[in-house]
Amino acid sequence: MSGLGDSSSDPANPDSHKRKGSPCDTLASSTEKRRREQENKYLEELAELLSANISDIDSLSVKPDKCKILKKTVDQIQLMKRMEQEKSTTDDDVQKSDISSSSQGVIEKESLGPLLLEALDGFFFVVNCEGRIVFVSENVTSYLGYNQEELMNTSVYSILHVGDHAEFVKNLLPKSLVNGVPWPQEATRRNSHTFNCRMLIHPPEDPGTENQEACQRYEVMQCFTVSQPKSIQEDGEDFQSCLICIARRLPRPPAITGVESFMTKQDTTGKIISIDTSSLRAAGRTGWEDLVRKCIYAFFQPQGREPSYARQLFQEVMTRGTASSPSYRFILNDGTMLSAHTKCKLCYPQSPDMQPFIMGIHIIDREHSGLSPQDDSNSGMSIPRINPSVNPGISPAHGVTRSSTLPPSNNNMVSARVNRQQSSDLNSSSSHTNSSNNQGNFGCSPGNQIVANVALNQGQAGSQSSNPSLNLNNSPMEGTGIALSQFMSPRRQANSGLATRARMSNNSFPPNIPTLSSPVGITSGACNNNNRSYSNIPVTSLQGMNEGPNNSVGFSAGSPVLRQMSSQNSPSRLSMQPAKAESKDSKEIASILNEMIQSDNSDNSANEGKPLDSGLLHNNDRLSEGDSKYSQTSHKLVQLLTTTAEQQLRHADIDTSCKDVLSCTGTSSSASSNPSGGTCPSSHSSLTERHKILHRLLQEGSPSDITTLSVEPEKKDSVPASTAVSVSGQSQGSASIKLELDAAKKKESKDHQLLRYLLDKDEKDLRSTPNLCLDDVKVKVEKKEQMDPCNTNPTPMTKPAPEEVKLESQSQFTADLDQFDQLLPTLEKAAQLPSLCETDRMDGAVTGVSIKAEVLPASLQPTTARAAPRLSRLPELELEAIDNQFGQPGAGDQIPWANNTLTTINQNKPEDQCISSQLDELLCPPTTVEGRNDEKALLEQLVSFLSGKDETELAELDRALGIDKLVQGGGLDVLSERFPPQQATPPLMMEDRPTLYSQPYSSPSPTAGLSGPFQGMVRQKPSLGAMPVQVTPPRGTFSPNMGMQPRQTLNRPPAAPNQLRLQLQQRLQGQQQLMHQNRQAILNQFAANAPVGMNMRSGMQQQITPQPPLNAQMLAQRQRELYSQQHRQRQIIQQQRAMLMRHQSFGNNIPPSSGLPVQMGTPRLPQGAPQQFPYPPNYGTNPGTPPASTSPFSQLAANPEASLATRSSMVNRGMAGNMGGQFGAGISPQMQQNVFQYPGPGLVPQGEATFAPSLSPGSSMVPMPVPPPQSSLLQQTPPTSGYQSPDMKAWQQGTMGNNNVFSQAVQSQPAPAQPGVYNNMSITVSMAGGNANIQNMNPMMGQMQMSSLQMPGMNTVCSEQMNDPALRHTGLYCNQLSSTDLLKTDADGNQQVQQVQVFADVQCTVNLVGGDPYLNQPGPLGTQKPTSGPQTPQAQQKSLLQQLLTE
């Protein structure tokens, strides 16, 4: 040892000896070599002895260091010595043997195996390739109960469950045998696998056990197998490839400790209502009471300077619907420190009587105190995500307070969608609103968020995602059905009105709303297309708002507040305060609207075509009846007030989607919204009256009143907000919403004060934000929405056509619309306003490009489909066109356009914002294209200001908006004063006309009898301006579409706004004749172009395409007309003004056709519409109807009113030249197209083709100067072969064909229709625009066998000239000349164009007057005429002419 140690201690010794000895002595070297070998051998033995695990040494590729071995040997010797000493004391033999230096290892192999198996907690067995157990360890008994001998040489499959055989074989056999594919290196590679298998437990050997199988029991074992491909030779036996297995019991899964949690229920103010500790009690832990106390205390304890988690979560929950807190710590009484996190969710109970509440899950984390609540998926309660539809800015308490009242409704989708789209997206883009709305703010400024939230909340109130489609934007609020307005207004909470709005999870409309099935309700739901950003926002947000807390949203006007909110929302109109008021009021309004809609929608649903007439008449009657029925009307007024703005905004969406009832609901929620709509006109007639109603409602404090007030403030707020459609405007809206929420939060009693404050505040905001012009326009449009039927055109005027012209036209139209809306109540009585309003609102719905595609498709899918694509191309123009197509391009579209244009066309917004203070300038739009483009924006601003004028009559709102002066300057009051009396007659006229149209059109399309006629009316509503209607309603295209229920929107009251517009324009003529021209151009574009122009252009014009004569000749004529377009535009604009004035004076009937939209639409159509091809497109748009009937007329059959409206509009527009030649040439090919489109499709009975051809070709072929427009009208009117044989004949052929078609479509009376139409055309020509209504009616009548009617109409106009219908045809020209002479005589003081206008006015009055007899002749018109009770045509003529002349 010592020698070895020496040598090892001196490692260099061996080498040194070697070096020293090797050179001298070989013997010495060999001896040294042997010594080294011996030394190495000893070292190896030492290493083996020292190694506790021989395998470790074997595995070493390099020999261990000698010094280490020796050192360890020394250590080991010392250890052994100590052990020997211990041995002597303990006498441990085993240890002696283990440590014996003579043993091969520290542990004997015999004892190593059992120790290893024990450590493995399993048994060991080896299976050969045949599956036989060649070896099994003895401890198998403790696992399976078998003895070692029992299992040796038995098949392993005997103890394996049959289901595990395949798995075992897979591991036992080489892969090449299992898979049939040779595996490289398989022969030399070890494969180890671990798998689970069931092994049989030894069955009991009880003699009583007969059925061994029944006693079989298997235990799942985990097998670790190693395949030994090489043969093993041991003890002379050759073990071929085998599988070495170790089986052990599966580790027992650790006991799962239940998550400790308890739940709290908080009200919408954040107070804990109840605590559920059942899970804690079930856990059996002691001290759970202390745990709950400490946890809640820590949860509500402020976090340093930060508010408590409870407050933070409450705010987040109220905003987003769900929230989770980070982990917070607390110490129990026993000193144990625990951590917990809380998850909260806003829940809406199914019962409408229950308030919304916040469920909080407090999860205790004893082990991972740092675990964030988000990480903890084991929350006792899964908190449904509530999208943050509620504006985060809204105080959660406010929102929560009313959540329980929110009824679950499928409208959640609408409301959610509306909220999304209510966001500034109205301003930005449709797609943006949806995505941004999905976010907490739904992409809208705080105000808009609130509005959207309100809409969402109201829409989703009762339904926690009960309507999955509602949760399109996945807004937590939406999902939970939370309504921001609920939170915003504690009053809502107390308000059962909302709750009563039946929180039907599947019915977006309150159960008490019978007309939920009515198109209004349906459209309301159907038109919440996410695609519509602005348009959709108004509709859905309005609906969502209405639907949520006000399940009455089923009707589009279900919650005017909501709708208004939605319309306001898009321009940030929904300021926080209005949102709060709306949330409260929306319930109330929802209930009110619900009732109204029950009555009105019942009417609407009962008679889709007639309901609007009856409902609107009823509503108008209520409105006319005044305060005696204000209880009802006040609700409806509340709706109207709340919906006017919303309808304007929504009209884009709702009108399109709710073409029938929705558009009407916009006006009257079908009839119900229209009471508001009608009220709106009446309130328009006296906005001050409407304002009084608001205050009255505030004073009464009724939920619906409050809602109305809230809606109105919201409108106002939205006006500032809409002004701030830009971010700033939205932020203002948000701030106001927050303010309102706070106020509602503080006191429900302050709701009135708050509403008043909001009204004032909105006014102030509007003043302070003149740049919010467009938003103001929206707001005003909202208010005009009451007069929305006519407002639609003004707003559409703000469509893609020249912004300035559009804006100016819009604003002027808005002023006219204000007047018209003043007349609207009467018109609504005529039940035409409702349908027009419906259409208008539907048109308004069309305003949004997205909405058009989404909303329009439902109501006017054919035309709407075209409109939607066109809208994509020409957002503004298309919207306008859609509006007109829907029959109320002027009002609904205008108003929606105010918002939609703002949102869709932000360019207009900024301009409006900048130009809001430039109302006067806006009133005078430039005539140039650039000027018109500027006018587009200016028109939007004007529309906003004119809408403000509506609110001016609501003195506070108008003052706040600074619209008082505008209204006063615009003479809305005068017009309302002048027109209200006329209203009675015009509405009757309108009613007669709808009836006439219903009958004539009923014959061609009995199914659309009312629907079709109302569709016509709806389209005629776009003819608020006579021209716009004609252009606006592509009868062919929209006839089928309008067939849904546009006819309900037959509300011709828009004509009243036309009259108002005419009067307003006449008023402004002196100061702003050029402006009026531009505005009228915009009107034509807007009404004919925007409402109908766009659709007409892409759709309607296509409809007209079927008329090759119109195309070929009109192209040439229109080219010529284009040359003289400026000149003729001025003439036509003046004529239209006169017509508008006449319509204002003499007819609410005519107004739809000769409404502002006509004026504005006519100029605008030329701008935006294709020049020559509009006619064919118009025809193309008519695909829905027989081409032979000049598809417009086919559709006119469906929408006789629309056709008439178109004709009226055409006549009104193209008094001198039926918008084709004169107006078309004067205005533009677009206008001609639109005009002709309408005349072609809509006015063909009047010789639309004739009118258009004669107008376009006649105007162009017989291109007439300013006087020729008059002649042009006359020419167009007599386009019969008698007038101008070549061009006129060609046009007449097309026109006659159209007339025949129209006769066929409307009524198989081609001959009477043609003569009647032509006679009417003559009358119309004579009347220029004035006879438009009669023309419209006469063509319709002629189709309806109205030849005599047409003759009476003509007799009215020029009865003195010619009474013979046959002569009429020929006499048309004479009549025209006589009319022209008469016109000249009447308008001697005026320019020739003005003379034509005066003539048109006179003729329009005559037409109305004559139209009365004319209408009286047909059963429907005659029936309705008594309602109108118009004076004798001549008397009316005189008074109207006097008024017009005085104007």
UniProtKB/Swiss-Prot annotation:
Chain positions of motif LXXLL motif 4: 694-698
Residues joined by cross-link Glycyl lysine isopeptide (Lys-Gly) (interchain with G-Cter in SUMO2): 852
Free-text description of this protein's post-translational modifications in UniProt: Sumoylated; sumoylation increases its interaction with PGR and prolongs its retention in the nucleus. It does not prevent its ubiquitination and does not exert a clear effect on the stability of the protein.
Region (Interaction with STAT3): 361-568
GO biological process assignments: cellular response to Thyroglobulin triiodothyronine; cerebellum development; cerebral cortex development; estrogen receptor signaling pathway; estrous cycle; hippocampus development; hypothalamus development; labyrinthine layer morphogenesis
Localization annotation: Nucleus
Bias kind Low complexity: ranges: 419-441, 465-476, 663-679, 724-735, 1271-1281, 1431-1447
Role: Nuclear receptor coactivator that directly binds nuclear receptors and stimulates the transcriptional activities in a hormone-dependent fashion. Involved in the coactivation of different nuclear receptors, such as for steroids (PGR, GR and ER), retinoids (RXRs), thyroid hormone (TRs) and prostanoids (PPARs). Also involved in coactivation mediated by STAT3, STAT5A, STAT5B and STAT6 transcription factors. Displays histone acetyltransferase activity toward H3 and H4; the relevance of such activity remains however unclear.
Protein name listed in UniProt: Nuclear receptor coactivator 1
Organism: Mus musculus (Mouse)
Lineage: Eukaryota, Metazoa, Chordata, Craniata, Vertebrata
Gene: Ncoa1
